């Protein structure tokens, strides 16, 4: 079983290799067929037949590539489930530790613990969903799209598996070029502007993270997490290190005044890109806090809690009011993501066990719910109407009853309604906030009111609002089997873990306790 972590990173690369290899092979076949009869009239007939064969082969290739990519992501999901089954949650040590590669005197180590395993599972669950979401809507450069998705899966998993902070930074930043290309190639009308926004914002923010990592390396002499976690930096040094790390993660979360890139990226990104962004990429900052701030810089994270809480509260209020005024459904969901990200940011900085565990649960729940909402908005509604303007939708409950039910359940999850994973995560996050700073906890709880307000307002205008919209005058049909499968899968995870959160909490408790108290 020592090669399971290798497999998580290698399987997507094998999928990319097969996509590229089969393309070259089929191209040679069609080229030979088209050139075989070019010297006679009979050959001309063969040539036209060869062209027809080429078209048929190309059409079959596209579906074949999609199947290869989908099977690849499913194989990775199976491997991650095997790792979860074999994982020992009674220890806080990294498990399945492997020396993946040796470069001169530098070794690359992989490992997984009770915190990272849930992010690995989230990644392997979301990636096949992101792949299927654009199964029919993307009709050009399909190979490039599939390769980007598989490459993103490898890079995201590498972030959660590496045991070296410098490698964490390298893979953390390596995600940007594929996202840049994904939005630039497959985005909407302002895709170039959006791709540059996401690249520049996150790259400039991460430069501060690099400076902090290099400072740690010069002071301690290593960048391995296990060694750094046993270090004790001076208080003044911790201040400067914290500023560098927090700025990078504040951009990635994102917090107030640093969220412009996320809104443009979500609105202009293809559906699969929005799902990856909301479901996984936004969780990189949450994971980074557990690796670089709480264990390495405990004094600052404890003493500056009120400042971080204030930033989170301002972000919640700003994002919520912005959500209430927007008319674009994808932009509304993006603002909602900013608000929920601020809540789990507050929870993990509460330095209370319940608050930290709640922040993780809310991050996981948000990954499921936001992905489902983006499928509803950018997949079901946009594919049928060609618009994202909320005022153009009304009365979908009359013509799309099954969709309206699924959409309503996801909206309940976004509100943090009981029996959903988001409710458990938000409740525990706010509990940790109240335990730490009751007054700021009171302001933080406004997120539950605001989220209910803008989510119900959105659903009411789309599902009801009088007679159905002109976009639905013809019989457009309810959700397809593919759309139902995607939405139902995400709903199952949201409700199952909402009813029985101990499935996650039991595995988290020992590692979170060790994180806080160094046991």
From Swiss-Prot:
Q: Name one GO cellular component term.
A: mitochondrial membrane
State the organism of origin. Podospora anserina (strain S / ATCC MYA-4624 / DSM 980 / FGSC 10383)
Membrane spanning stretches: 2-22, 68-88, 112-132, 146-166, 167-187, 196-216, 239-259, 270-290, 304-324, 333-353, 360-380, 399-419, 437-457, 484-504
Q: What is its EC number?
A: 7.1.1.2
Name the coiled-coil region(s).
none
Q: Give the protein's recorded name.
A: NADH-ubiquinone oxidoreductase chain 4
Instruction: Report the main location listed first in the record.
Output: mitochondrion
Q: Which topology term describes how it sits in the membrane? A: Multi-pass membrane protein
Q: Which gene encodes it?
A: ND4
* Compartments where located: Mitochondrion membrane
Q: What does this protein do?
A: Core subunit of the mitochondrial membrane respiratory chain NADH dehydrogenase (Complex I) that is believed to belong to the minimal assembly required for catalysis. Complex I functions in the transfer of electrons from NADH to the respiratory chain. The immediate electron acceptor for the enzyme is believed to be ubiquinone.
């Amino acid at each position: 079983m020592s090669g399971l972590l290798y497999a998580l990173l290698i399987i997507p690369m094998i999928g990319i290799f097969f996509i590229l290899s089969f393309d070259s092979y089929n191209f040679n076949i069609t080229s030979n067929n088209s050139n075989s009869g070019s010297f006679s009239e009979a050959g001309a007939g063969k040539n036209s037949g060869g062209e027809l064969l080429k078209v048929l082969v190309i059409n079959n290739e596209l579906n074949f590539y999609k199947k290869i990519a989908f099977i690849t992501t499913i194989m990775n999901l199976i491997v991650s489930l095997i790792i979860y089954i074999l994982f020992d949650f009674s220890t806080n040590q990294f498990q399945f530790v492997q020396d993946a590669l040796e470069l001169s005197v530098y070794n690359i180590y992989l490992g997984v613990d009770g915190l990272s395993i849930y992010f690995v599972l989230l990644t392997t669950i979301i990636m096949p969903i992101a792949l299927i979401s654009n199964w029919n809507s993307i009709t050009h450069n399909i190979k490039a799209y599939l390769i980007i998705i598989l490459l993103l899966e490898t890079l995201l998993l590498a972030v959660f598996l590496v045991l070296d902070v410098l490698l964490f930074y390298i893979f953390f930043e390596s995600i940007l070029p594929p996202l840049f290309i994904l939005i630039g190639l497959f985005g909407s009308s302002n895709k170039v502007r959006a791709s540059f926004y996401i690249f520049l914002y996150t790259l400039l923010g991460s430069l501060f993270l690099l400076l902090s990592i290099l400072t740690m390396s010069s002071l301690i002499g290593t960048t391995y997490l296990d060694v750094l976690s046993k270090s004790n930096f001076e208080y003044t040094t911790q201040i400067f290190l914290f500023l560098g790390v927090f700025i990078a993660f504040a951009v990635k979360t994102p917090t107030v005044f640093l969220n412009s890139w996320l809104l443009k990226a979500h609105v202009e990104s293809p559906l699969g890109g929005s799902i990856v962004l909301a479901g996984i990429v936004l969780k990189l900052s949450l994971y980074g806090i557990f690796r670089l701030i709480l264990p390495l810089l405990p004094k600052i994270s404890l003493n500056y809690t009120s400042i971080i809480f204030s930033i989170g509260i301002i972000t919640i209020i700003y994002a919520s009011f912005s959500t209430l005024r927007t008319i674009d459904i994808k932009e509304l969901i993006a603002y909602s993501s900013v608000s929920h990200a601020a809540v789990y940011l507050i929870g993990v900085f509460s330095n209370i066990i319940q608050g930290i565990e709640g922040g993780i649960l809310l991050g996981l729940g948000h990954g499921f719910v936001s992905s489902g909402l983006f499928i509803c908005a950018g997949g079901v509604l946009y594919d049928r109407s060609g618009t994202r303007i909320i005022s153009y939708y009304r009365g979908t409950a009359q013509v799309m009853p099954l969709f309206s039910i699924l959409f309503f359940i996801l909206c309940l999850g976004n509100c943090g309604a009981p029996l959903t994973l988001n409710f458990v995560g938000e409740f525990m996050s706010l509990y940790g906030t109240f335990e730490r700073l009751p007054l700021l906890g009171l302001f933080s709880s406004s997120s539950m009111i605001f989220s209910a307000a803008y989510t119900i307002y959105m659903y009411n205008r789309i599902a009801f609002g009088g007679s159905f919209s002109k976009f639905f005058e013809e019989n457009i049909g309810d959700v397809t089997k593919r759309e139902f499968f995607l939405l139902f899968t995400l709903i199952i995870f949201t409700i199952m873990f909402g009813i029985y959160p101990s499935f996650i909490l039991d595995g988290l408790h020992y590692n979170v306790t060790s994180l806080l108290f160094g046991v």
